[in-house]
Structures are given as structure tokens and as C-alpha cells.
């Protein structure tokens, strides 16, 4: 199962999945990507 959560540290609109993933990894998550109509950075990891 994959858990997802909005990044606490990502600022501004999410336009790069790579940048989002890097921020998520710094927060202790496995990665992340831009998601939804508002392009929020969502972090992911196994749970």
C-alpha cells in the first residue's frame, strides 16, 4: 500500500516532479510528484 501526504516544505506551485521528489526525500519520504488541479507536491512512501 502507498501512503500519500502533501509536502510540508514545498513552496509555491509544483511544476517539476523531480524537485518535488527531492523535497519529499529530505522530509523522510520515498519520493513525490505534482498532483491535482492545484499542482500540489504530494509525497509518497510504502506504509
UniProtKB/Swiss-Prot annotation:
Record has Heme as a keyword: no
Domain of life of the organism encoding this protein: Eukaryota
Annotated Pfam families: Gamma-thionin (PF00304)
GO biological process: defense response to fungus; killing of cells of another organism
Task performed by this protein: Inhibits protein translation in cell-free systems.
Family recorded in the similarity comment: Belongs to the DEFL family.
This protein's name: Defensin-like protein 1
Species lineage: Eukaryota, Viridiplantae, Streptophyta, Embryophyta, Tracheophyta
Amino acid at each position: 500500500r502507498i501512503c500519500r501526504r502533501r509536502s510540508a516544505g514545498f513552496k509555491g506551485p509544483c511544476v517539476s516532479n523531480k524537485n518535488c521528489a527531492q523535497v519529499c526525500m529530505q522530509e523522510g519520504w520515498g519520493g513525490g510528484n505534482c498532483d491535482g488541479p492545484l499542482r500540489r507536491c504530494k509525497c509518497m512512501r510504502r506504509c
